[in-house]
């Protein structure tokens, strides 16, 4: 058997030797080389050049070594392979270096520079050798240049700025070591020009270092950059108490918002990029200390807890004032011999500010309808109470319906309901006409607002919290800091959170929302006590007290704080709807509350109101996903916006006394014919018409703006529609209140003035624009700025502080605006 197998073995050995002779080199040239010397040599498939370098490595001094290679022959054949063999690492690269871009584009680089990874040494000092092998499979000679040099500025120092140049084939990285007592630093990299696009990476001191465009994202933290980048680094994340700052220029600029270069038609043809060099500066500075975190949290708590203290002081003052008022009333009642009782400011004086007005009176009203509508006598339809008696509450008979209608006119609630078309279509209405329903029924109706929004909050918030935690986990695991749009120059991490300060600043919404709920609870308790003791002012005077919408508003403010904090865990394009959803809720609830004040019986139910808000949020999601540059979407949305505006205008103008059915167009034509063609008659409800015309002008203008401009930030555009309508209605309400002869008391007046000022400052900080997800992450970082408050909070944090205070103040305005009517009979309070 052995004799038979021997010829085959000899044949196999001969075959291997022949292959080695063809594939392997015949000559190996090994030479001792020196630093800072340029070697110009040739290599081919028959020759391998090996350069031997040695240098002294010390424990306390880190020295960088850089290898520069330039191939002088421009050939498309076999490239040169450079292999650097070190004690604990091997680096290999080919020249010309080919890097891939999008769509597998090829970019070729003749000149390549690489920094060698320096493994740490345990000895005090030792001599280390490394070898540079140069080989190729090209049969012809290829000339190249080789130079190995030391890097004197390889180690970065705290507070010292260092500038350098880099290209895609000549990446740079530097080492930073944490000084004693420093637990966190921020690495800032800047450049005077935006392009070429570059990548900044923070990697642990390990070999190999990933410093090429095609592998820089494999490890560590990284972010793209145009002119500005910043990464906060914590000592606890690096066991060696040091890290590498890696700077890589990308082959293409699309990741930074740039355009793709021209690509040749020849298949697989390399692209000549020309001179894509970028000059950058790196600065490592100490980040904030733990004392800054403590002071930031104490400052945040101090600001908003002071509102609690101020509320307690005002409550004590109001309690003292009420006790004093009660005592004076008791003294007056105990001294009837004085001839005339003491008249209090909050009682019904004979010369009240409402005397002399007859807003909305009818001419020639028969005696049978005197109880239904207050008569003004001689046909003067101007505002005022001329010729009207203004009897004290105590002298009027109580009616369960709390209206200006005499009990003899209506027998049952069913009769009243059957006459809605008569009551609600009068030319001039009073609150008593729209406050006929049972108080207990209305109370339950408006409490549903609170319970519904609480349920919505739970079901909406839980998946949001889960999602943003997942986003933060992905950022921490992958190191990709382009996922979230922070203000990286003022992003202070805590635990797993990357920007704790942006989350902390939302605490104001939660604390002030809770405070508003406590204020509403106290008001409701006081009102219920007044009802229990049959206080006639509570029963028959002022705007009917329904607190359900106020509870819903306070809950919405708290949820806005929670969801805004969730959004700022990882702010980006897809998460922004979390920040705006409850803003839509707040705007809608405020408008409903304004309408409810004068229309308590005909306000929208909680189910229909939240259904409409759900439709708004639905369109918000559609706009975020499909609205960017989509003309068809904007056409459909603008049409729906205009139709919804017209339907709501009709509903408000006719107080709900109209029907949307098949005969609607016939009725519209009939009204146009009778009121516009046969005779030109003005609108029956002038004030409502003025409001609705202004509202339609604004909404049609916003619809036209959206259709023409098609803004990228659809969620903010939708929010602007809600805010504009709310401000319009708010201004109309205040103007009509003053026009009706009503007054604004001191506390709501102060709230209006202070809230307006705070809103002005808040909007100033909001429009600073520290980041924007409408651009690429690299472009967004160009807007980043340093902290401006306590070295801990930035402009957007101040927006959170001020806007939460402004929203709280706006809620207080809604709560106290009609306090001057608390002693005015409801049949003397106008509806507008």
UniProtKB/Swiss-Prot annotation:
Post-translational modification remark: Glycosylated.
GO BP annotations, alphabetical order: cell morphogenesis; glucose homeostasis; regulation of insulin secretion involved in cellular response to glucose stimulus; response to glucose; RNA catabolic process; RNA transport; type B pancreatic cell development; type B pancreatic cell proliferation
Residues annotated as glycosylated: 27, 54, 60, 123, 141, 165, 476, 496, 572, 603
Signal peptide: 1-18
MF terms in GO: AP-1 adaptor complex binding; AP-2 adaptor complex binding; DNA binding; double-stranded RNA binding; nucleic acid transmembrane transporter activity; RNA transmembrane transporter activity
Transmembrane regions: 297-317, 448-468, 500-520, 547-567, 606-626, 632-652, 689-709, 716-736, 747-767, 797-817
Places the protein is found: Lysosome membrane; Cell membrane
Family matches, as Pfam families: SID-1_RNA_chan
InterPro entries: SID1_TM_fam
Record keywords: Cell membrane, DNA-binding, Glycoprotein, Lysosome, Membrane, Phosphoprotein, RNA-binding, Signal, Transmembrane, Transmembrane helix, Transport
Ranges of the Extracellular topological domain: 19-296, 469-499, 568-605, 653-688, 737-746, 818-832
Main localisation: membrane
Residues the record lists as Phosphoserine modifications: 401, 403-404
Cytoplasmic side: 318-447, 521-546, 627-631, 710-715, 768-796
One cellular-component annotation, GO: lysosomal membrane
Subunit structure: Interacts with adapter protein complex 1 (AP-1) and AP-2, but not AP-3 and AP-4. Interacts with LAMP2.
Entry's family note: Belongs to the SID1 family.
Protein name: SID1 transmembrane family member 2
Annotated source species: Homo sapiens (Human)
Lineage, uppermost ranks: Eukaryota, Metazoa, Chordata, Craniata, Vertebrata
């Amino acid at each position: 058997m052995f004799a038979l197998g021997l010829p085959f073995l000899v044949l196999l050995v001969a075959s291997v030797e022949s292959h080695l002779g063809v594939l392997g080199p015949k000559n190996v040239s090994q030479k001792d080389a020196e630093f800072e010397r340029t070697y110009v040599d040739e290599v081919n498939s028959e020759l391998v050049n090996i350069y031997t370098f040695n240098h002294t490595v010390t424990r306390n001094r880190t020295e960088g070594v850089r290898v520069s290679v330039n191939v002088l022959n421009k050939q498309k054949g076999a490239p040169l392979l450079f292999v650097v063999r070190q004690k604990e690492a091997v680096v290999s690269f080919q020249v010309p270096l080919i890097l891939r871009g999008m769509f597998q584009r090829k970019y070729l680089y003749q000149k390549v520079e690489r920094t060698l990874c320096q493994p740490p040494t345990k000895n005090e000092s030792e001599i280390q050798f490394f070898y540079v092998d140069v080989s190729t499979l090209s049969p012809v000679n290829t000339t190249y240049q080789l130079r190995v040099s030391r890097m004197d500025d390889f180690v970065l120092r705290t507070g010292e700025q260092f500038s350098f140049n880099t290209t895609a084939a000549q990446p740079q990285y530097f080492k930073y070591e944490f000084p004693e007592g420093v637990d966190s630093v921020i690495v800032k990299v800047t450049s005077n020009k935006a392009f070429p696009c570059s990548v900044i990476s923070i990697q642990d001191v390990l070999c190999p270092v990933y410093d090429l465009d095609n592998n820089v994202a494999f490890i560590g933290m990284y972010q793209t950059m145009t002119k500005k980048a910043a990464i906060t680094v914590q000592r606890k994340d690096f066991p060696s108490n040091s890290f590498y700052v890696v700077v890589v220029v990308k082959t293409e600029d699309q990741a930074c918002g740039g355009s793709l270069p021209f690509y040749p038609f020849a298949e697989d043809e390399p692209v000549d990029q020309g001179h894509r060099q970028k000059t950058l500066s790196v600065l490592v500075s100490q980040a904030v200390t733990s004392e800054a975190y403590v002071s930031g949290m104490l400052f945040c708590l101090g600001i908003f807890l002071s509102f609690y203290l101020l509320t307690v002081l005002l409550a004590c003052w109001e309690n003292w004032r009420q006790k004093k008022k009660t005592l004076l009333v008791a003294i007056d009642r105990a001294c009837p011999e004085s001839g005339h009782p003491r008249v209090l400011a909050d009682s019904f004086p004979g010369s009240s500010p409402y005397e002399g007005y007859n807003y909305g009176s009818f001419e020639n009203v028969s005696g049978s309808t005197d109880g239904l509508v207050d008569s003004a006598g001689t046909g003067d339809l101007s505002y005022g109470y001329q010729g009207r008696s203004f009897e004290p509450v105590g002298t009027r008979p109580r009616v369960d319906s709390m209206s200006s209608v005499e009990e003899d006119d209506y027998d049952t609630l069913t009769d009243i309901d059957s006459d809605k078309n008569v009551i609600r279509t009068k030319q001039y209405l009073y609150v008593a006409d729209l406050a006929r329903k049972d108080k207990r029924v209305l109370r339950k109706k408006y409490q549903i607002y609170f319970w519904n929004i609480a349920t919505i909050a739970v079901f909406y918030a839980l998946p949001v919290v889960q999602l943003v935690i997942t986003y933060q986990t992905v950022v921490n695991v992958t190191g990709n800091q382009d996922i979230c749009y922070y203000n990286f120059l003022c992003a202070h991490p805590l635990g797993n959170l990357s920007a704790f300060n942006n989350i902390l600043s939302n605490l104001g919404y939660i604390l002030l929302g809770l405070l508003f709920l406590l204020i509403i609870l106290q008001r409701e308790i006081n009102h219920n006590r007044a009802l229990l003791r049959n206080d006639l002012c509570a029963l028959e005077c002022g705007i009917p007290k329904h607190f359900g919408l106020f509870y819903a508003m306070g809950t919405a403010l708290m949820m806005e704080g929670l969801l805004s904090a969730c959004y700022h865990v990882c702010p980006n394009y897809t998460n922004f709807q979390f920040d705006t959803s409850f803003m839509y809720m707040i705007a809608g609830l405020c408008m409903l509350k304004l309408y409810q004040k004068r229309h308590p019986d005909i306000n929208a139910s909680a189910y229909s109101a939240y259904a409409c808000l759900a439709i708004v949020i639905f369109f918000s999601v559609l706009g975020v996903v499909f609205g960017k540059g989509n003309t068809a979407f904007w056409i459909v949305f603008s049409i729906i916006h205009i139709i919804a505006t017209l339907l709501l205008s009709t509903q408000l103008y006719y107080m709900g006394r109209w029907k949307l059915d098949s005969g609607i167009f016939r009725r519209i034509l009939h009204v146009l014919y009778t009121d516009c063609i046969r005779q030109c008659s003005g609108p029956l409800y002038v004030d409502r018409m003025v409001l609705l015309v202004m509202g339609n002008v604004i909404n049609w203008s916003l619809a036209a703006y959206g259709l023409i401009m098609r803004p990228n930030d659809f969620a903010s555009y939708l929010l602007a529609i809600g805010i504009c309508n709310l401000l319009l209605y708010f201004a109309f309400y205040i103007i009509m209140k003053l026009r009706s002869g009503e007054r604004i008391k001191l506390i709501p007046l102060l709230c209006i003035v202070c809230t307006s000022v705070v809103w002005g400052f808040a909007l100033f900080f909001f429009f600073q624009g520290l980041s924007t997800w409408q651009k690429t992450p690299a472009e967004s970082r160009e807007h980043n700025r340093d902290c401006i408050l306590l070295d801990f909070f930035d402009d957007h944090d101040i927006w959170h502080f001020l806007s939460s205070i402004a929203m709280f103040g706006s809620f207080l305005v809604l709560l106290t605006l009609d306090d001057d009517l608390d002693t005015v009979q409801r049949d003397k309070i106008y509806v507008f």
